[in-house]
Amino acid sequence: MRYYVETDGRVFLVERGDRLDLPRPEEIPFPVEPIAPLVGDDVWFCVPSLDKHPRSWHHKDDLPTSDRALPEVRSAIHATMPRVVVEGLCLREGRILLVKGSRGLTEGRWTLPGGFLRFGESPEACILREIREEVGLSGSIDRFAGVRSKLGRRSRLHWTMLFYRVAVHGEPTPAPDEIAEARFVPIDQAPEMLHDEDMSCVLRGLTDRPAG
């Protein structure tokens, strides 16, 4: 068992020869709180209890390119990076647009249109792009509708989900390489169709009314 200990963008590591490695529990000279596993069950993310800022610890942003950092350190850092996705709530006359993926994490599952936020992209631009790419519809932002954050049960990644109400016109045309099916379904039926509980929770609190 090894711990990944991070605070304020700095990481506590130990030296093994000329390499930097993740510490074992007995090598940590301060209290820590284990939060969740990162890489398999052998590496856990931990929060330290400290009296002051750890100036001598290693900068997290420097470690991925450090020749001294062992691959396990780099893997742990990669696992801690939040994954940001943007989801669209496209409502029409008491119905909401759902899509069923044809590949990847959502293959064969109903979900909301949306996807990963690109580097340098705004969330608003992201969701409009994703809707256009997935179902061929142009849209306009109605309003921000909420944010959810979780640790994935299977992926063990930290997911941040941003939700936007989006007005779209026309009928969806699924992009076959990405979407197997797309349709508007009654809002009260949609939460039970979705595979993601956070999406379902957002929809259960949703009302079909204009902003203002």
Region spans (language model):
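Conserved N-terminal beta-strand and adjoining loop/helix that marks the start
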Residues: 1-12, 74-96, 113-116, 165
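Conserved Nudix-box catalytic region and its N-terminal flanking loop in Nudix hydrolases
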Residues: 4-40, 95-133
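Acidic, metal-coordinating catalytic segment for phosphate/diphosphate chemistry
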Residues: 45-89
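Acidic pyrophosphate-coordinating catalytic loop
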Residues: 77-79, 148-161
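Short, well-ordered beta-strand micro-motif
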Residues: 90, 163-167, 183-186
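A short coil-to-beta-strand element that immediately follows conserved catalytic motifs
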Residues: 138-147
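Phosphate/ribose-recognition catalytic cores of enzymes acting on nucleotide-derived substrates
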Residues: 157-171
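A generic structural signal for short hydrophobic patches within well-formed alpha-helices
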Residues: 190-191
